[in-house]
């Protein structure tokens, strides 16, 4: 009798994201008799012929796969429906596509529903927002099961004290000056466009006085960033400001900063959504065009920072959530009442 297999599929260039990695680690420990397969090939390139071949390969793999776990639109529509024993699970990590769909339907609600995820048998939306989005704007087969009221694996993990302690030790190893301080994380994602003349990309924060901002932020805060534009600005700071500022690249991952942050400033829907379970302050900082920014500006305007200078409007002596931040946290994460990894383990233990 052949072994049961579980396939992790990611075809949008994201590889095994943190949610998939956490689920994989748990399943490998809990189900040692199961074989695991991976299809992580990006299917969108600049060469149409390659795209066609990659799509054919993805369709063949997913058709033959016994069980699939994905976290984005990686399961093709043009494959047969799953059999009664097969599981196709979508972990709905809050990537930008969710906000793109929401804004399109908000502006034009009469559009036909999308079939993007129609071959999934199980969906873990991770938040009330995503659950409503998927029910409102997507088509599903009759037998689909929504695993509601359960946070995503990374959100659950962010609250686990053992992991928080491990990451804290790592932070204090690299930045001993952060010990005992509150952590302000400025985590920005996106690729700056390359200038046509071949010169270096411009610093998008060039016009801002970082010293003024650092002086404004109370001394009981330590500012952490992954952003090189901010690091370049930090060269203008006197040495004593190193007690308040650190650059985490090649030291600590962006995801790990979710475990430690007391306030998050980001342009990433994924990080904002994952962090919302902590019920701590979140702000969106405009840095490269993001549909998530349009969403925040329209529906949570007090959380929107149009530029770096607007940090000077924040009250760093108060970490109580504003009414809009409370609403955001309620909308973008379920309460941590059930371990998502254990739920997924039960789903595949048949």
Feature roles, as predicted:
Residues 1-66, 75-76, 193:
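N-terminal pre-catalytic "stem/leader" segment of glycosyltransferase-like enzymes
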Residues 17-26, 147-236:
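Conserved catalytic-core segment of nucleotide-activated headgroup transferases in glycan assembly
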Residues 21, 46-113:
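Extended catalytic core of nucleotide-activated donor transferases of GT-like folds
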Residues 51-65, 224-273:
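Donor nucleotide-activated moiety binding/catalytic core segment of transferases
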Residues 73-94, 135, 251-293:
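A donor-sugar binding/catalytic signature common to diverse glycosyltransferases
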Residues 98-99, 105, 112-195, 324-327:
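A nucleotide-sugar donor-handling region in carbohydrate enzymes
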Residues 238-241, 270-336:
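Catalytic binding pocket for nucleotide-activated donors in carbohydrate/polymer assembly enzymes
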Residues 335-350:
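C-terminal alpha-helical cap of glycosyltransferases
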């Amino acid at each position: 009798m052949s072994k049961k297999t579980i396939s992790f599929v990611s075809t949008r260039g994201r590889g095994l994201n943190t949610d998939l990695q956490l689920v994989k680690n748990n399943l490998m420990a809990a189900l040692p008799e199961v074989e695991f397969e991976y299809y992580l090939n990006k299917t969108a390139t600049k060469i149409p012929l390659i795209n066609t071949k990659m799509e054919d390969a993805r369709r063949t793999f997913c058709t033959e796969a016994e069980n699939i776990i994905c976290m984005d639109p990686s399961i093709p529509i043009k494959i047969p429906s799953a059999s009664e024993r097969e599981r196709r699970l979508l972990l709905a990590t809050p990537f930008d596509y969710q906000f793109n769909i929401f804004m399109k339907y908000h502006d034009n609600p009469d559009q036909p529903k999308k079939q993007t995820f129609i071959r999934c048998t199980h969906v873990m939306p991770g938040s009330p927002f995503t659950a409503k989005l998927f029910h409102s704007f997507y088509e599903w087969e009759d037998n689909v099961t929504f695993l509601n009221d359960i946070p995503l694996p990374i959100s659950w993990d962010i609250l686990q004290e053992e992991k928080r302690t491990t990451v804290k030790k790592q932070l204090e190893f690299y930045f001993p000056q952060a010990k005992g301080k509150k952590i302000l994380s400025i985590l920005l994602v996106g690729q700056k466009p390359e200038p046509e003349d071949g010169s270096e990309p411009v610093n998008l924060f060039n016009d801002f006085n970082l010293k003024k901002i650092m002086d404004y932020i109370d001394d009981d805060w330590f500012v952490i960033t992954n952003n090189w534009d901010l690091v370049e600005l930090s060269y203008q700071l006197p040495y004593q400001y190193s007690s308040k500022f650190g650059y985490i690249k090649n030291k600590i991952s962006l995801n790990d900063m979710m475990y430690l942050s007391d306030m998050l400033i980001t342009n990433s829907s994924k990080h904002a959504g994952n962090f919302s379970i902590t019920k701590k302050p979140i702000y969106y900082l405009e840095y490269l065009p993001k549909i998530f920014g349009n969403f925040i500006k329209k529906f949570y305007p007090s959380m929107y920072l149009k530029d770096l200078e607007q940090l000077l409007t924040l009250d760093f002596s108060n970490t109580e959530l504003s009414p809009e931040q409370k609403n955001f946290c309620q909308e973008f994460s379920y309460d941590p009442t059930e371990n998502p990894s254990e739920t997924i383990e039960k789903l595949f233990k048949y």
